[in-house]
Amino acid sequence: MSRITDVHIHIQPWWQLKPTVQEAMRKGKEDHWELLISMMDDPRALLEVMDRSRVWRVGLVNYPSPDIMGFDDSTNAFAATYAQANPERLIPYGGVHARFTKDPTGDVDRLIDLGIQLIKIHPPHQAFPANAYTDGLAALGKIYRRCEERGLPVMVHTGTSIFPGARSKYGNPMELDDVAIDFPDLRLVMAHGGRPLYMEEAFFILRRHRQVRLDVSGIPPGKLLEYFPRLAEVGDRVLWGTDWPSPGVKDLRQNIDQFLALPLAPEQQQAILETNALALFPMESRTHA
């Protein structure tokens, strides 16, 4: 396969990470930490890794989380600028922090003007549930509404997070039931499938709401069918992702090869690795109305 898209990798301004967060990120990567740091500065280094791994495109996950992770709003400009090195292969993601924004609608518009292709909401790292607009966080509802109006997909982290200060109680995918009902034309990507505590909830949301897609990043590929034994039923809405180089994810290609060893039909493998991402990020339309 020559058109593999990994919709979930972390190329971010890691120099903004809080010291305790950076320590957790660095664990297990000591022997190649400097290479990873250089990759955050140099898109050519990432493209070389992608070429070796036979990965065509990647989604560059970025979002503000100043109080928990350390990332400020400049992470959006970082992603947009980084992706300019190869707009065909590098897809920039950004975020608007619902607890801190003073102009949620305008901030979404400004990200689109920057070239951001997807908004990332990270409940455990931003300290609110994905449906917090139902309980007073009006800015979050305005973010969803503007993304719905502009056709901008929204990725929501589901499941736990190991980083210091992360609020894993906000990672339950069931909160997306409200979002999918209240914003029926919003394209939602459910990152990580609720791993490891909320897999059944994630599958329920996926089956109930056609506009929700599942991103399998952060799930060991060899356990994917153990966690989601009925994956083939929703195979047209499953997106390939690795979460690389987050803790526990060593290699882009290794994960792909482990996935290809699963007892899935070739057409299902192709849909997950290639076709479904092309429907979300079509090459002929990388801008939004």
Residue ranges and their predicted role:
Residues 12-15, 65-68, 98-102, 126-128, ...:
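Active-site environment of divalent metal-dependent phosphoester hydrolases
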Residues 4-7, 60-61, 93-95, 188-191, ...:
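Active-site neighborhood of phospho(di)ester-bond hydrolases with catalytic His/Asp-centered motifs
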Residues 117-118, 132-240:
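Catalytic pocket-lining loop regions of alpha/beta-barrel enzymes
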Residues 43-47, 76-83, 108-109, 140, ...:
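Generic structural signal for well-ordered alpha-helices
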